[in-house]
Amino acid sequence: MTVITEANKTKARELTAQLTLDEKIAIVHAAGLFRNGNAERLGIPPLRMDDGPMGVRAELHNDNWAPLYNTRDYVTYLPSGSAVASTWNPDLARMTGEVLGEEARGRGKDVILGPSINIKRSPLCGRNFEYMSEDPVLTAAQGVAYIQGVQESDVAACAKHYAVNSQETDRLDVDETVSERALREIYLPAFEAAVQDGGVLSVMGAYNLVNGTKCCEHKQLLDDILRDEYGFDGFVVSDWSAVRDTKASAEVGMDIELSVTPNFDDYYFANPLKKAVEDGDVKE
């Protein structure tokens, strides 16, 4: 299974020290629908991402959600998250992840954007089929097995959507007001297990707000809990166009801004981030 070693970290630090500001900026925002930029000079390729969690998504155009109709493209359709969790069988969850990881690697993907380990709270949520359970213990157990299966093939799993993203209605702006106890006992255990037991390599920041702060700008969630408390040393990506403030997101450990726009200037982590660094508002 893919793990981040001290040797990996040393190499990453050495490469980072050689990057120009423009190369750093290219890497931290999308350069297409499912990939970020690269640093060709140093041999750093883009991360090629794709949706799970119910099978690798068929190939799409680089700058929109339209399928490539001129390809004979077939993928394996896998059980939904709710079906996987309903087995109460970690071995089957891991097997599902293994199939997904093998197919993703065979198609040249580096990251699978799943599993979805949000807690089901409303029967009206349009993505409940994708989430595993209303039970944080079951979600954690099945999510860990799923992640381990995916990462057997040197493909990074991405635990999403962090955090408290349990409804689709007004998901871009809804403010989820939640007590510390409920946060710790209901909404975060699956993410904690994903990091500490599953070794998940990536986490996706959600659209919604938690107690008045957007998830992709949330110091408590991203820095204090995810990195400092759980020990997460992978990378955090935003949900599509979930970054709304350059400085706020950059300062709390948002690593890659994802979106679909082909316009470089439309990314908060593109020219606005470069200017913020040059002006001294954000540390390079």
Short names for language-model regions:
Residues M1-E284:
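Glycoside hydrolase catalytic-domain context in secreted enzymes
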